[in-house]
Amino acid sequence: MDFAIQAGDLGKYYGDCIVAGVFESRKLTEAAKALDEMCRGYLTKVLDQGDMDGRANTTLLLHNVPAIGSKRVLLVGLGKEEEYVEKVFLEAIRAAFKALHQTGVKDVGLCVADLIVKGRDTAWSVLQSTLLVEESVYRFDRLKSKREERQPSLQKIIFLIGDEAARAGAEQAFKQGAAIACGMNVTKDLGNLAPNICTPTYLAEQAGEMAKTYNLKLSVLEEKDMEALGMGALLAVARGSHQPAKLIVLEYHGREGIEKPVVLVGKGVTFDTGGISLKPAVDLDEMKYDMGGAASVFGTLTAVAEMKLPINVTAIIPTTENMPGGNATKPGDVVTSLSGQTIEILNTDAEGRLILCDALTYAERYNPDVVIDIATLTGACVVALGHVVSGLMGTDEPLVQELLQAGEKASDRAWQLPLGEEYQELLKSNFADMANIGGRWGGAITAACFLSRFTRKYRWAHLDIAGTAWKSGKEKGATGRPVPLLTQFLIDRAQQH
């Protein structure tokens, strides 16, 4: 998809379709008013005939509008003006692109200048629109014998802004949006692949391709390397699978010198049966998404590399399957982690924290500025927060606040949960330094408490994306989250330094 900015007179746009908004009661936005004046009230006349009343997410496509340079005009309903908020804007843009894909348009002029939501600016509107158009053309059909015959015809979006002064910010926004969308597509593709294809070995191969494309430093630890180091927790999860586990490290050096890196640690369980603590059969196929944390780290690093951000980022991806078998870890087994701490494994389905704890300890050797782990860690987080926001906890409050603010900017929000010492009591074991589960209550918090025991040498935050990494049902598929949040966090950090 190509993007461009055009400022000034809407009459100078001569493309396939121009998109403008209409509020309820047929109230035209400023851009729609300008178009209406050009065509001498034609839009008002059509609306007065009852073809559209401006209700949210409705659309009206008009052809050959008099005195308009564009071949078509698409009017998009924005609902009540006093209720026009961010959610309405995003849904309106989705509705517009859905309608456009039913046509043969190749280029579109989007009037973003007067679609701005209170508290946002033109740059935000451009960035979000860029993400939404890329989302609208995303298809995952590589595993089908016959792909969809009709592919989206849309090739170019021209953002029509009223003020030339906003051009620089808008141009930067669509470039960032295109990079983030590229990263989200990487995350979606990895998540949507079948688990017999997307194995730990496949992820290591993809890391190799990525290292070549973006000139990254790559290292991969094999099981023998992990055993030599003493990664007993990660290897305990891998024991039931015929697929060898990997620990993948990708290093992006965007800033010269000795600046400490931001380390992103992504949980990469490419299929999670639960192990001996076997999961129910219902929706078990969705456990291919249990590598959503790893996929989001791949995607975020892609976005960073596409933008050539002046920042150092290290990605650490522990990856394995969690399978039952004669050699699988049993409930009650005690293992020694890389940190030297011992863990009683009471539930083999609490495996994500086991592979993460060794990866978090391994992160120490990179002398990190901060460490953020991303994981589809707990069903408890989904119970608490649903599928709208990601769970966020951490031992460093300024870091947590940075991530919360980045999520707000990116419209990819997280919500902070407590991480009090009182919860640590729930991880006590009679036979080891700790248990890998903390009982029925506060499961998302006790999982984070477990991880915190392996992060005492640096500033750390944890994103639980179990509710946001994928969708179920008719729209089943990976979402690409939290790539926007993480990328915005890194953009902000690069600008600060």
Curated annotation (Swiss-Prot):
Transmembrane segments: none annotated. It catalyses: Release of an N-terminal amino acid, Xaa-|-Yaa-, in which Xaa is preferably Leu, but may be other amino acids including Pro although not Arg or Lys, and Yaa may be Pro. Amino acid amides and methyl esters are also readily hydrolyzed, but rates on arylamides are exceedingly low; Release of an N-terminal amino acid, preferentially leucine, but not glutamic or aspartic acids. Pfam families: Peptidase_M17, Peptidase_M17_N. Keywords: Aminopeptidase, Cytoplasm, Hydrolase, Manganese, Metal-binding, Protease. InterPro entries: Leucine_aapep/pepB (IPR011356), Macro_dom-like (IPR043472), Peptidase_M17_C (IPR000819), Peptidase_M17_leu_NH2_pept (IPR023042), Peptidase_M17_N (IPR008283). Gene3D superfamilies: Leucine Aminopeptidase, subunit E, domain 1 (3.40.220.10), Zn peptidases (3.40.630.10). The active site is at residues 279, 353. Its EC number is 3.4.11.1, 3.4.11.10. The keyword Nucleus does not apply. Binds 2 manganese ions per subunit. One of its GO terms (molecular function) is metalloaminopeptidase activity. It comes from the Bacteria. Its cofactor is Mn(2+). Mn(2+) 2 binds at residues 267, 272, 290, 351. Belongs to the peptidase M17 family. Presumably involved in the processing and regular turnover of intracellular proteins. Catalyzes the removal of unsubstituted N-terminal amino acids from various peptides. PANTHER family: CYTOSOL AMINOPEPTIDASE, LEUCINE AMINOPEPTIDASE-RELATED. NCBIfam families: PRK00913.1-2 (NF002073), PRK00913.1-4 (NF002074), PRK00913.2-4 (NF002077). This is Probable cytosol aminopeptidase. The gene is pepA.
